[in-house]
């Protein structure tokens, strides 16, 4: 566990904590986290996860803007529920993206193509949902983190294992807080 990996994980934890609070500073701290994490993931030969960090970078810029100006009349975006039709489409898209990513990654020197494909596809959807402040992003993050903790333990990436364990707790907390925010704004 390198000091660089620890700092990257720390920025990730701060970013997610701030997200649970709907604090706009979650996005700039995310930019630092994903920039640093991409280097570590590249060294671990988790290539889809490296690409995912690039996606997170772009969505962090998008989310920063959306949270500030994505609401009605360019106001602050409020927590909302996803429409069922969109939710169903996202499930189908996630399944296709997982299969497609797995197919591509299985033909590369990726160290864990299936798990990397799952992380990639599901995280893309969850991050976009978070940028749009859909409360349902949090149970998706809970599921991802339940997979990530044992995975990073198995590959001896202990800083990221700890990060994802903390993310799991934060995702549960964020889910509760965003649901309360949704009820309060109704």
Task: Give the location of each predicted region.
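Helix-loop junctions on the outward
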Residues: 22-25, 37-52
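Polytopic alpha-helical membrane-helix bundles and their juxtamembrane interface segments
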Residues: 1-22, 26, 33, 67-72, ...
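Membrane-water interface of transmembrane alpha-helices
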Residues: 54-71
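Interfacial loop at the N-terminal end of multi-pass membrane proteins
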Residues: 39-40, 44-46, 56-59, 74-80
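Individual alpha-helical transmembrane segments in multi-pass integral membrane proteins
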Residues: 7, 49-58, 164-165
């Amino acid at each position: 566990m390198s000091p660089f990996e620890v700092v990257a994980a720390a920025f990730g934890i701060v970013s997610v904590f701030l997200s649970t609070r709907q604090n706009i500073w979650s996005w700039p701290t995310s930019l630092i986290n994903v920039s640093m994490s991409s280097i570590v993931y590249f060294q671990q030969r988790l290539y889809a996860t490296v690409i995912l960090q690039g996606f997170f970078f772009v969505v962090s810029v998008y989310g920063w803007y959306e949270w500030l100006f994505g609401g009605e009349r360019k106001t602050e975006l409020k927590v909302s529920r996803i429409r069922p039709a969109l939710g169903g489409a996202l499930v189908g898209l996630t399944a296709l993206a997982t299969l497609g990513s797995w197919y591509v990654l299985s033909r590369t020197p990726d160290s864990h193509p299936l798990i990397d494909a799952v992380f990639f596809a599901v995280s893309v959807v969850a991050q976009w949902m978070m940028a749009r402040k859909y409360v349902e992003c949090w149970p998706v993050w809970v599921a991802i983190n339940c997979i990530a903790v044992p995975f990073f333990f198995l590959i001896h990436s202990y800083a990221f294992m700890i990060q994802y364990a903390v993310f799991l707790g934060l995702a549960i907390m964020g889910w509760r807080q965003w649901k309360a925010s949704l009820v309060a704004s109704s």
